[in-house]
C-alpha cells in the first residue's frame, strides 16, 4: 500500500510541471467554429484564451488547496492546455463563455473581400 502511494506522489510531481490536454469538440457552425472544451475545476478568472498566427490556445489553471490535511488525495493542481489551428479567421469576432465546467469559444470565418476587376491603362 505504501509503495503505491510513493509512486502516485512521484507521478504527481512530474505531471504538475507539464501541461495536460483536455477533451474538446470543434464544431463547424453557420459562420465559423464553435469549440467546446472540458475544464472542470477551473475558475473563470484562471482561464486564458489567446490567438496568434492562426493558432487559438486555451489554458486553464486548476488549483487545489495544498494547505489541508488529506486522508487520501487524488486531485492535484495542474494546468490544462490545448491549441487549435484555425487558419484565417476574423480574430475580432472571437468570443468565449464558461459554464458548468465547459469553456465555449465562438470564432467567425473571415468575410471574403470581393475584389473588383481593375483595368490597367497602358502608357
List the predicted regions and their residue ranges.
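Short structured motifs
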Residues: 20-23, 68-69, 80, 89-91
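An anionic, turn-rich surface loop/hairpin at beta-sheet edges
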Residues: 64-85
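Core FKBP-type peptidyl-prolyl cis-trans isomerase
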Residues: 37, 43-68
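N-terminal leader/pre-domain low-complexity segments
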Residues: 1-36, 55-59
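Intrinsically disordered, low-complexity terminal tails
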Residues: 112-123
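Beta-rich strand-turn-strand
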Residues: 42-48, 85-114
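Well-ordered beta-strand positions in beta-sheet-rich domains
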Residues: 23, 81-83, 117-119
Amino acid at each position: 500500500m505504501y509503495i503505491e502511494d510513493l509512486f502516485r506522489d512521484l507521478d504527481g510531481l512530474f505531471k504538475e510541471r507539464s501541461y495536460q490536454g483536455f477533451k474538446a469538440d470543434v464544431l463547424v457552425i453557420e459562420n465559423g467554429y464553435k469549440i467546446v472544451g472540458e475544464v472542470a475545476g477551473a475558475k473563470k478568472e484562471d482561464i486564458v484564451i489567446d490567438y496568434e498566427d492562426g493558432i487559438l490556445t486555451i489554458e486553464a489553471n486548476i488549483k487545489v488547496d495544498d494547505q489541508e490535511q488529506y486522508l487520501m488525495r487524488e486531485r492535484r493542481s495542474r494546468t490544462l492546455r490545448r491549441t487549435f489551428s484555425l487558419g484565417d479567421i476574423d480574430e475580432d469576432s472571437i468570443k468565449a463563455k464558461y459554464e458548468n465546467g465547459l469553456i465555449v469559444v465562438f470564432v467567425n470565418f473571415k468575410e471574403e473581400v470581393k475584389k473588383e476587376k481593375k483595368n490597367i491603362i497602358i502608357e
